[in-house]
A protein has these predicted regions:
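Transmembrane helices and adjacent periplasmic/lumenal helix-loop junctions
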Residues: 394-420, 439
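Bacterial N-terminal signal peptides
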Residues: 7-16
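Exposed beta-strand-loop-beta-strand "reactive/processing" segments of non-cytosolic proteins
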Residues: 52-95
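Boundary at the C-terminal end of the N-terminal hydrophobic targeting segment
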Residues: 18-23
Length: 517
């Protein structure tokens, strides 16, 4: 009996292929989509975040489109509203029917407005324990604990109050985040103007802690910051642009007009949105695109040359060790410069206090953890201030700072008239400024036609930035929906007043103290 069953089983196994032979196997295709176009649109429009934002626009202006991504099984939904353009976009999961992403207003065009976790600086610096730890160290280390309602303590709290704006920024709530940054900015502007006019700060007592304790805290905080940068930070597009610019200079090109773009043959994978950043560039290399990265002054790229020459660049937007090297260097040089400034103008206590203030302030670490070039302008101003009695050094510092990011060019008239408005020191300042400017712009000589290179520089930097729209200030918000004011006229008026004020401080006061400088 057992032999019969075994023989039958073997026969069935052998017969199986023969029985299946007459018909070809039918390939298994991808499963059909579950939702229809209309259903995907309706689900997205019912999302609370989307519906709240769309309420700002007349429904008759809405135009909605939905496309299905077969590979990832989701619907991409886009909504337009007349002249406002695209006002909402997101994803609907086809399997569950849930809205997996919903971006509205400024979040549509600006991914940095979406509040993605750790997008700026990494998750560690943005975590509550680390951030609030820096806040506590900064306040307790510098506060006048004997007088809790002193002006010094108010100044410190205002400096820390930018945390509220950052908290909303990290949630992707730009419409709330941006206005919250203006009250502390206005306070600090008024505070500095009043102190400069009076010639004294009026903050009273020095920190209560002994020098050795502040010095120890400074060393500890500096080491902790270094560890955060090396192990728990990221490099945003600003730091990436510095490395690209250094690469172009080292290879005999001006950075302007030579940044990697998304036009050549793809040489890397596409992301979930179908965007392929890595492309073959005109130099034949596979590089990650950063098409608008050449918008800063020349010093913003030249300062990355040491890091690039030491650590190189793969062509990709990867860990970018050269950017980390530069960012850490900028940070430490600011600390050293502040210590020297304090030592020169106030002795050991002020030296330690200024260094401590930098390493304890959370936003300086935010800059370091994001590996940007934002520490460069203050770096040159700090060292120029240290050498304030030498007009040429002030000129060099003002020029290098201004040709990194153009805003600090406003300090040039003030610095040119220190300690008083006299022709000879002003001329020496101008010579230092001119020499530093020529050195900074010498990279334009790397191009076959320096005049054309200068025009490209203008077009890629100030020419582009003047008309650039951004959601990270209130001036361009009118584009988003009805009810938001058009502030462009006010912006132009304030810009003119700012330039007038920058020129006026060359003349008033006639004699200036280091504090006023």
């Amino acid at each position: 009996m057992r032999r019969a069953l075994a023989a039958a089983a073997i026969g069935l196994l052998l017969a199986g292929p023969a029985l299946a032979a007459p018909g070809k196997p039918k390939p298994l295709g991808p499963p059909e989509q579950r939702l229809t176009v209309a259903q995907a649109k309706a689900i997205f429009l019912r999302n609370e975040k989307v519906s709240d934002w769309l309420a700002h626009y007349p429904q008759r202006l809405w135009q909605t489109d939905a496309t299905f991504d077969q590979d990832h099984k989701f619907w991409r939904v886009n909504v337009w509203a007349g002249e406002a353009g695209e006002v909402a976009t997101g994803k609907v999961d086809d399997t569950s029917g849930a809205v997996s992403e919903a971006w509205t207003g400024p979040q549509v065009a600006w991914k940095m407005a979406r509040g993605l976790p750790g997008a700026f600086g990494g998750k560690e610096i943005n975590s509550a324990p680390v951030w609030l730890g820096f806040c506590a160290l900064f306040f307790l280390g510098l506060a006048d604990l004997r007088r809790p309602f002193s002006l010094r303590n108010l100044d410190l709290l205002v400096l820390l109050s930018f945390t509220v704006s950052l908290w909303f920024f990290n949630r992707g709530d730009i419409i709330t985040s941006v206005p919250l940054a203006y009250p502390p900015l206005l306070y600090l502007l008024g505070r500095m103007a009043w102190s400069g006019w009076r010639g004294r700060l009026g903050t009273g007592a020095v920190p209560v802690w002994p020098i050795w304790l502040l010095a120890a805290a400074t060393v500890f905080a500096a080491g902790f910051r270094l560890g955060l940068n090396v192990r728990a930070s990221n490099v945003i597009d600003v730091g990436y642009s510095g490395v690209i610019g250094a690469n172009r200079i080292a290879n005999g090109q001006s950075p302007y007009g030579h940044f990697p773009v998304e036009l050549g043959k793809a040489c890397g994978p596409s992301d979930i949105d179908g965007e392929t950043r890595e492309r073959i560039q005109t130099n034949g290399r596979c590089e990650s695109a950063n098409p608008q990265g050449d918008t800063y002054g020349p010093v913003a790229y030249e300062a990355y040359l040491p890091g690039y020459l030491a650590l190189g660049w793969t062509g990709k937007w990867d860990d970018l060790p050269a950017a980390h090297f530069a960012s850490i260097g900028f940070d430490l040089l600011c600390v050293l410069g502040l210590a020297l400034v304090g030592l020169r103008f106030g002795g050991q206590r002020l030296a330690v206090t200024l260094a401590f203030a930098w390493v304890a302030y959370p936003f300086t670490q935010y800059v370091s953890s994001s590996n940007t070039n934002d520490a460069l302008p203050p770096l040159f101003l700090i060292w120029g201030f240290w050498l304030a009695t030498w007009p040429a050094a002030r000129g060099v510092g003002a020029a290098l700072s201004g040709w990194t990011k153009f805003g600090s060019l406003l300090v040039a008239p003030l610095w040119a008239s220190y300690p008083e408005r006299r022709l000879r020191p002003t001329l020496v300042f101008a010579v230092g400024f001119l020499v530093a400017t020529l050195a900074a712009f010498s990279i334009l000589l790397l191009e076959p036609n320096p005049v054309h290179a200068a025009r490209v520089f203008w077009d890629r930097t100030l020419g582009w930035q003047i008309d650039r729209e951004s959601p990270f200030s209130i001036w361009d918000w009118r584009q988003y929906h009805a009810g938001l004011p058009d502030l462009h006229i006010l912006q132009r008026v304030l810009e003119v007043l700012l330039i007038v004020a920058a020129l006026a401080v060359y003349f008033v006061p006639r004699r200036k103290s280091p504090l006023q400088l």
